[in-house]
Amino acid sequence: MSAPDSKESEKEFDLLQKSFRRPFFLSFTIGVPFCIFKLLFGLTATRIGAGTNIFLDIFGWIVVIWAIGDLVLNVSRGILDLMHRPLPFEYCLIAEVGHYAKKPMLFLAIDTLLTFSIVCFMLWSFWIARLSLPEAYLWFFATTLNLISLSLVSVYNEIVFYRANRISTG
C-alpha cells in the first residue's frame, strides 16, 4: 500500500470514528432504543397493574413519563448535533441530574444499568410475552439497532487496534 493510500485510509477511519462518537449516532443507536425499552416496560406495568395494583399502575406511568422525557432529550440532542448547535443538556433525565451533581457520566452509567435491568426483568419475568405484536416489533427494532450498532463499533475498534499494532510493529 502506498503512502497516499495509507493517509486516505487513515482519514476515512478518523471520519468513521468521529461519526461513532457523535451525539446523533449515540442518541439514535443507544438512547432511543433505551427509551423504547423503558416505555414498553412502563406500559406493560400499567397494563398488568390496571384495576388490580394501584402501585404498579402508578409506577408504570412514572416509567412512561421517564421514557418520554429521555426520548425528548435524545431526539433533541441528535437534531442539535446535526445542526452543529451546542448541546445544553444530557442524554437522559438521570444524567441531567448528574450534571448538577457534576458527575453526568456516573449518572448516565446508572441509567444504563437501570435500563439493562429493565431488559432483563422483561425477559426473566416473561412480561415480554405480554407485549402486543406492534410493541414486540418495536422491542425487536430497539434491540437490533442497539446490538448491531454496538457490534459495528466493536468491529471498527478492533480494526483500528489491529492497524495501529501492525503499523507500530512494522
Regions found by a protein language model. Give the residues of each.
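Alpha-helical transmembrane segments and their membrane-interface junctions
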Residues: G31-F41, A109-L138
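Short membrane-interface loop/juxtamembrane segments of multi-pass integral membrane proteins
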Residues: L87-I110
